[in-house]
Amino acid sequence: MEKLADLNYTLGVITLLNDTLHNILEEPGMVYFPYIVSALTVLFTMHKASLPAMKLAMRTFQCSYRIIKRVVVTLINTLLRLGGYNDYLTDKDETEKQINRVVKELRQQLTMIEKLTTREIEQVELLKRIYDMMIVRHDSEIDMSKETNQKAFKTLHDWKNDRSYDDNTEVIAPL
């Protein structure tokens, strides 16, 4: 017990392990040793972490299949990521969720496109009406049916020769 607490002894053990690993790695056949060790470490950790989850899943019959499937998919995805692959596995529920999300987004985009198209059509019609109103037409083409009757009003020449309505006139009211 005293040897375990001794710092020099601990450093000696660590030095011995490092020297052993360096001697092993110098051999040409052991180039892949660190990769193998890291993969085995991950597998051991996943094994230790997944066993309690599997035991719990087996006790509950209702969700055991889903939990086991989820654990297996997670394990495979972890191994794929450790291997450097960007692909991953999905279960059926996850795929259906993604499909539903994509369909929902497509419906929203279609309604937005429909609204925008309706607005654009209305704007084009409004621009056409404005353009039609701005076009210079000949006198024969102008529809005078909506114009007021100009004959009842005095012209500018009549105003010059006649008395102005602005002149003060005396108004006598009967008492």
From Swiss-Prot:
Cytoplasmic compartment spans: 52-175
Keywords: Activation of host autophagy by virus, Calcium, Enterotoxin, Glycoprotein, Host endoplasmic reticulum, Host membrane, Host-virus interaction, Ion channel, Ion transport, Membrane, Metal-binding, Secreted, Signal-anchor, Toxin, Transmembrane, Transmembrane helix, Transport, Viral ion channel, Virulence
Lumenal side: 1-28
Post-translational events: The N-glycosyl content is primarily Man(9)GlcNAc, with a small amount of Man(8)GlcNAc.
Spans through the membrane: 29-51
One cellular-component annotation, GO: host cell rough endoplasmic reticulum membrane
Top-rank lineage group of the source organism: Viruses
Any single Pfam family the record assigns to this protein: Rota_NSP4
Primary subcellular site in the record, as a coarse category: host cell
One term of GO molecular function: toxin activity
Residues that hold Ca(2+) according to the record: E120, Q123
Glycosylation sites: N8, N18
Single biological process term from Gene Ontology: symbiont-mediated activation of host autophagy
UniProt membrane topology term: Single-pass type III membrane protein
Listed HAMAP family: ROTA_NSP4
Domain notes: Binds 1 calcium ion per tetramer.
UniProt family annotation: Belongs to the rotavirus NSP4 family.
Name assigned to this protein: Non-structural glycoprotein 4
Native organism: Rotavirus A (isolate RVA/Mouse/United States/Eb/1982/G16P10[16]) (RV-A)
Lineage of the species this protein comes from: Viruses, Riboviria, Orthornavirae, Duplornaviricota, Resentoviricetes
